[in-house]
């Protein structure tokens, strides 16, 4: 089978109005993909930027996949959360990006968004925190239901990904 190695890190995030940020991440693939090593999801530590608005996580990603075809190419999805001084967490943004299909090192910037909700939910978010969240996580990367949401732009998640492709020519998989 053809193999894909995804090695890199979630560098951090910038452009969020909230501070004390952390990120929950995961990777979604099609049915023809098999994870040989690594973990499909994880969470970074909380970082509060001291200078500027960049929260640094330097969270490693190391995944090894085998595949029979290109359909269902891996997509990384993110949930960025902020934590207040009482330890309460509220959603700062959702985002996703496709893993690049060409080998080499890639710098990625993944824009995020969050659902707005009704004016009452927006008012409650401003005063007591919280706010609307997605019921189904796959809405982040599947566009079928996403177009109906009213959203607000969030910040950007920054990644550095190295991609290695192996045996694609031997098994007739063309990139």
From Swiss-Prot:
The keyword Nucleus applies. One of its GO terms (molecular function) is gamma-tubulin binding. Changing residue 5 to Q: In MKS10; uncertain significance. It is found in: Cytoplasm, Cytoskeleton, Cilium basal body; Cytoplasm, Cytoskeleton, Cilium axoneme; Nucleus. Changing residue 155 to S: In JBTS34; uncertain significance. Its main location: cytoplasm. Keywords: Cell projection, Ciliopathy, Cilium, Cilium biogenesis/degradation, Cytoplasm, Cytoskeleton, Disease variant, Joubert syndrome, Meckel syndrome, Nucleus. It holds the Pfam family B9-C2. It comes from the Eukaryota. GO terms for cellular component: centrosome; ciliary basal body; cytosol; membrane; MKS complex; nucleus. Residues 2-118 form the C2 B9-type domain. Belongs to the B9D family. It is linked to Meckel syndrome 10: A disorder characterized by a combination of renal cysts and variably associated features including developmental anomalies of the central nervous system (typically encephalocele), hepatic ductal dysplasia and cysts, and polydactyly. Joubert syndrome 34: A form of Joubert syndrome, a disorder presenting with cerebellar ataxia, oculomotor apraxia, hypotonia, neonatal breathing abnormalities and psychomotor delay. Neuroradiologically, it is characterized by cerebellar vermian hypoplasia/aplasia, thickened and reoriented superior cerebellar peduncles, and an abnormally large interpeduncular fossa, giving the appearance of a molar tooth on transaxial slices (molar tooth sign). Additional variable features include retinal dystrophy, renal disease, liver fibrosis, and polydactyly. JBTS34 inheritance is autosomal recessive. Component of the tectonic-like complex, a complex localized at the transition zone of primary cilia and acting as a barrier that prevents diffusion of transmembrane proteins between the cilia and plasma membranes. Part of the tectonic-like complex (also named B9 complex). Interacts with TUBG1. This is B9 domain-containing protein 2. It comes from Homo sapiens (Human). The lineage of its organism: Eukaryota, Metazoa, Chordata, Craniata, Vertebrata.
